[in-house]
Amino acid sequence: MRINPTTSGLGVSTLVEKNQGRIAQIIGPVLDVAFPPGKMPNIYNSLVVKGRDTAGQEINVTCEVQQLLGNNRVRAVAMSATDGLTRGMEVIDTGAPLSVPVGGATLGRIFNVLGEPVDNLGPVDTRTTSPIHRAAPAFTQLDTKLSIFETGIKVVDLLAPYRRGGKIGLFGGAGVGKTVLIMELINNIAKAHGGVSVFGGVGERTREGNDLYMEMKESGVINEENIAESKVALVYGQMNEPPGARMRVGLTALTMAEYFRDVNEQDVLLFIDNIFRFVQAGSEVSALLGRMPSAVGYQPTLSTEMGSLQERITSTKEGSITSIQAVYVPADDLTDPAPATTFAHLDATTVLSRGLAAKGIYPAVDPLDSTSTMLQPRIVGEEHYETAQRVKQTLQRYKELQDIIAILGLDELSEEDRLTVARARKIERFLSQPFFVAEVFTGSPGKYVGLAETIRGFQLILSGELDSFPEQAFYLVGNIDEATAKAMNLEVESKLKK
């Protein structure tokens, strides 16, 4: 028996040492390995190259079998740099796919694609591992009931509600609040649903991954004093990694999330940033394996690869994985095969607006651009649906009137339009909300607003009952009662000033 070399530290399953081969060819991150007749590894088996380079430095490279070439050769993709490898080096077939640590011990830790901790906090204290390749849950295991996943964030719950076990696309440029929104969702799922989160950094900037980790520590999402009380596990395969690592890191994160769903029976949030990089890495690997490219140079297996990842993200009778995926749209072309294939799997889109961020309205979720398949009367109920539609109509009318206001001013509008504008401005401000994770920056205590409270608040604004209140009373508050109290305080303050 020997330790599984695909992961490190405690809690690694042991595998019988299987077959040995030799490197026959190296093409960048791709290796051809020759095995003795009848000793060929299976597709997706993990191979390990151990030895020393010409300078005497130790080498330990893990690869994944992608093709069986014939003549007792296989083609494998490396999960780390192939620097220093030479022909003839010994390769060990572990006899199983890549396996990664799973369970509560992963919370608060950072892992690479192989499930190795990279945060210098020592080995992971778990004996449970799981292979990253597995079938999607069977139809009989799926929970087909449509239910809303309440986030406690007003703009999301009212206008673009998330489906429990659904997939949400998160669109937004740099600096509009993606990270803070992600951290608030991680915080709220832990408090309201007793759930945990897994963050998969797929092919994005290492600096951003580091910033996210530091901000999570600062806001308490990761508890440095008691790491077991952390609410999130982080898995990174960043831009500088070989394409094999970037292609598989999403599966590593998903495998950790599946354990929380299937064994711990929890509601899990899975973040993937960025799903486009998963496709991009697959395209690079496909070219290295010599496959004929398809439309726009993408891999011919694009839909299959995307489907095998997305179909595992679902609700079962045990628990749910709700996935929020940042989507990069190359050259803003929504018809590009990568985003187009992603859209087919999404249940909702949350679009962050730079214009709203510039106004200081956070979360800067665009209420008119964000959509959800869940916003139907038979799913959310007539009251929720009617309120959401009226809010959108009011905001749309305000948007149409903005050019007239900019040129002629408010006084030139009809009485009805002036009332619409006043209510729309109150709605716009009431869609903002103080976040728990931003408390350390803003000094304002965070607020979790239940769906029923959210609907009641917007109904009161639309009914005209609050027309006499100043619009600043609705800015950065939780429920409508707080807005009313703030309006009273503002009135008292203005009287005292007089």
UniProtKB/Swiss-Prot annotation:
PROSITE patterns listed in its UniProt record: ATPASE_ALPHA_BETA
Gene Ontology biological-process entries: proton motive force-driven mitochondrial ATP synthesis
Subcellular location as annotated: Plastid, Chloroplast thylakoid membrane
GO cellular component: chloroplast thylakoid membrane; mitochondrion; proton-transporting ATP synthase complex
Protein keywords: ATP synthesis, ATP-binding, CF(1), Chloroplast, Hydrogen ion transport, Ion transport, Membrane, Nucleotide-binding, Plastid, Thylakoid, Translocase, Transport
Keyword Protease found: no
Primary location class: plastid
E.C. numbers: 7.1.2.2
Domain of life: Eukaryota
Positions bound to ATP: G172, G173, A174, G175, V176, G177, K178, T179
Membrane topology: Peripheral membrane protein
Swiss-Prot/TrEMBL catalytic activity: ATP + H2O + 4 H(+)(in) = ADP + phosphate + 5 H(+)(out)
HAMAP family: ATP_synth_beta_bact
Subunit architecture: F-type ATPases have 2 components, CF(1) - the catalytic core - and CF(0) - the membrane proton channel. CF(1) has five subunits: alpha(3), beta(3), gamma(1), delta(1), epsilon(1). CF(0) has four main subunits: a(1), b(1), b'(1) and c(9-12).
Homology family: Belongs to the ATPase alpha/beta chains family.
Main function: Produces ATP from ADP in the presence of a proton gradient across the membrane. The catalytic sites are hosted primarily by the beta subunits.
Full protein name: ATP synthase subunit beta, chloroplastic
Species: Nymphaea alba (White water-lily)
